[in-house]
Structures are given as C-alpha cells and as structure tokens.
C-alpha cells in the first residue's frame, strides 16, 4: 500500500525537528451543495529544521515518531522550485 502524501502550509516551526502543517480539504456538502473548506493540523518530522512558517510543503505518512507525530517532511516547494531553476 503506498504512503499517503499531503500538501499543506507550515503554521509553526517552534519545536526542534517538528513542524505543524495545516492541510485544507474541500468538498461539496451533500445536502446544501455548497463547497465547504475544512482544515486539520498535522505534526511532521523535519530532520534538518529546514521548513519555515508560511512555506508550502509535502508531508508523507511514516512510522510514529511520538504520540502525535506520524508524518515526515518530504520536500518544501520553495526548495524544489529553486533546485529546478538551477538545474534548468
């Protein structure tokens, strides 16, 4: 089974090697037919402390690092865009 990958925005990087990522999902309400926005915060492991508040990042399911931290940072979009820009 493949690991889930989510995209979100870093809302906190105050703790060592941990970031809090807000992931927003949208769906259509079954009765009202209105688009509803819901968000959830995920604690993710950031080994190198590279992610900063406001960055858009990808997180991936992983082994439990602690009671609440079961996701890890895959890459941040700013670093990926910078690497693509220097490679091109």
From Swiss-Prot:
Keyword annotations: Ribonucleoprotein, Ribosomal protein, RNA-binding, rRNA-binding
Family matches, as InterPro entries: NA-bd_OB-fold, Ribosomal_uS17, Ribosomal_uS17_bact/chlr
GO MF entries: rRNA binding; structural constituent of ribosome
Pfam family, one: Ribosomal_S17
Biological-process GO terms, alphabetical: translation
Gene Ontology, cellular component aspect: cytosolic small ribosomal subunit
SUPFAM superfamilies cross-referenced by the UniProt entry: Nucleic acid-binding proteins (SSF50249)
Domain of life: Bacteria
Family: Belongs to the universal ribosomal protein uS17 family.
Function: One of the primary rRNA binding proteins, it binds specifically to the 5'-end of 16S ribosomal RNA.
NCBIfam families linked: PRK05610.1 (NF004123), uS17_bact (TIGR03635)
Subunit structure: Part of the 30S ribosomal subunit.
Name of this chain's protein: Small ribosomal subunit protein uS17
Species: Methylorubrum populi (strain ATCC BAA-705 / NCIMB 13946 / BJ001) (Methylobacterium populi)
